[in-house]
Amino acid sequence: MPYSLEEQTYFMQEALKEAEKSLQKAEIPIGCVIVKDGEIIGRGHNAREESNQAIMHAEMMAINEANAHEGNWRLLDTTLFVTIEPCVMCSGAIGLARIPHVIYGASNQKFGGADSLYQILTDERLNHRVQVERGLLAADCANIMQTFFRQGRERKKIAKHLIKEQSDPFD
């Protein structure tokens, strides 16, 4: 189902809310929602650190929730909104779930599986191809990632300072 720009913006803002949940837990802030007939049927945010599971990406969580909602592994007639371009693993899962449409915010130059590094979602050698749109609220989506990495650098500085204070009592 095609959505208007206003509707797409709303759903990406919902994905950004999911990304914010990850940011609050010091996780890489990626958020995702899956929409069918104008209703969000799956939500997810990155939770690898919290769960100690490498596959707990936003897209994987949203796919699992949408599968449960639909009672089916096939997520036909859905659109996946994600703040950052899906990685290779998530791109594979999107194809396997038969999600026909993906809209993402910012590119993923290091791990992108939709456009930047690999084109898994549109590869003609695969039996399921996905319509991909990019750049929706890209600045907002990139901004939350920059905030995460800036906070990480600040946490490292504080930790380094605390370690120095503890190890050198004569400072």
From Swiss-Prot:
EC number: 3.5.4.33
Entry's cofactor comment: Binds 1 zinc ion per subunit.
UniProt xrefs under InterPro entries: APOBEC/CMP_deaminase_Zn-bd (IPR016192), CMP_dCMP_dom (IPR002125), Cytidine_deaminase-like (IPR016193), tRNA_aden_deaminase (IPR028883)
Cofactor entry: Zn(2+)
GO biological process: tRNA wobble adenosine to inosine editing
Domain CMP/dCMP-type deaminase: 6-133
Active site, renumbered: E59 (proton donor)
Subunit relationships: Homodimer.
NCBIfam families with a match to the protein in the record: PRK10860.1 (NF008113)
Function: Catalyzes the deamination of adenosine to inosine at the wobble position 34 of tRNA(Arg2).
Family according to the record: Belongs to the cytidine and deoxycytidylate deaminase family.
Protein name: tRNA-specific adenosine deaminase
Source species of the chain: Streptococcus pyogenes serotype M6 (strain ATCC BAA-946 / MGAS10394)
Species lineage: Bacteria, Bacillati, Bacillota, Bacilli, Lactobacillales
